[in-house]
Design a protein with these regions (language model features):
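Active-site signature of cysteine proteases
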Residues: 26-34, 43, 47, 238-289
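Active-site-adjacent structural segments surrounding the nucleophilic cysteine of cysteine proteases
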Residues: 7-15, 21-187
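Extracytoplasmic/periplasmic, Sec-exported soluble proteins
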Residues: 153-162, 176, 194-198, 215, ...
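Juxtamembrane low-complexity tails/linkers enriched in Ser/Thr-Pro and polybasic
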Residues: 1-5
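Extracytoplasmic/secreted envelope proteins and their assembly/folding machinery
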Residues: 163-170, 181, 185, 199, ...
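Predominantly the structural core of cysteine protease catalytic domains
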Residues: 193-257, 285-288
């Protein structure tokens, strides 16, 4: 009787095909997540990030301690955030600005991952970045619709807190949410400096849209009174909201606390803040009406 010898490595091609198919499926899944991150709706897209962020506390000051930042990112990675895992794996090769951003706020991890991997082509659609149910529309500077648009020597996602804050205010005053950060950033280009954005931009942009701007003294009751007249643009120093300098909007005063639209953080925008918590970080306040 003729005996058929089993061919050596007969199952190897099948295993290779299975491995290849798994790789392709994971790749397509990643690309789908990236492309659809903001395309279904602002809420559905951004709400995904709230599955993560378990190791971050919005009440903590921002830090430049890389040991703490890496530990924060590891917690994110361990919770199942693949983009955080990638940042941890490439931690030592990333610019400090990227590490400070992603390590201090999990909301920004997807932006950092996309930026570093050249995933910057996203569909534009109208509407706020997140619906927070307040007087001032909410825009994020790192919203994929405009985050990668050039501003100064980087982009809106990095340096666009000023024009994003101004876009929120103008959208509210005009009742027109089509006034988005990408539009206002074009006006801001010539005001960008090494330290951020010139404060002259806010007065000039307010006048460009037909509004007046006035400086408000740092006093709790002055802030409350001013908010009855319109939204406030606030420049802050290092603390809860930034390491170095930042621009954001105070939307209103409710139940003894200030409601803030932070263009760089959803979590810090969802928390209300007492005067004592933020007053020592405020550098300048403007009322636009």
């Amino acid at each position: 009787m003729k005996v058929h010898k089993r061919k050596k490595f007969g199952c190897l091609p099948t295993l290779l095909i299975i491995v290849f198919l798994i790789f392709i499926l994971n790749f397509l899944k990643t690309r789908y997540n990236e492309v659809s991150y903001y395309t279904d709706s602002p809420i559905d897209g951004i709400s995904e990030i709230f599955n993560f962020g378990l190791g971050f506390d919005p009440d903590e000051y921002k830090t430049d301690d890389k040991r703490i930042l890496k530990n924060n990112l590891k917690k994110e990675a361990n919770s199942g955030n693949d983009k955080a895992s990638w940042i941890v794996d490439n931690f030592d090769n990333l610019d400090d600005a990227l590490i400070y951003l992603a390590g201090n706020d999990p909301d920004t991890i997807a932006f950092v991952y996309n930026y570093q991997n050249g995933i910057t082509n996203f569909e534009f659609f109208p509407g706020e970045s997140v619906l927070l149910d307040r007087k001032t529309p909410y825009f994020l500077q790192w919203d994929n619709r405009w985050a990668y648009n050039a501003l100064d020597d980087k982009n809106i996602g990095f340096y666009g807190c000023g024009p994003t804050a101004m876009a929120m205010v103008l959208a509210r005053l005009n009742g027109d949410i089509s006034i988005t950060p990408d539009i206002v950033s074009k006006d801001a280009e010539s005001y960008m400096t090494y330290g951020g954005i010139s404060w002259d931009f806010f007065s000039d942009e307010a006048k460009r849209y037909g509004y007046t701007i006035s400086e408000i003294p740092l006093d709790e009751y002055e802030l409350i009174y001013a908010l009855d007249q319109g939204p406030l643009i606030v420049s802050v120093n290092g603390g809860y909201f930034t390491l170095f300098g930042h621009i954001m909007v105070i939307d209103s005063y409710k139940d003894g606390k200030f409601v803030i639209n932070d263009p760089n953080s959803i979590r810090k925008s969802q928390k209300s803040w007492s005067y004592d918590e933020i007053s020592n970080q405020i550098a300048k306040i403007w009322l636009i009406k």
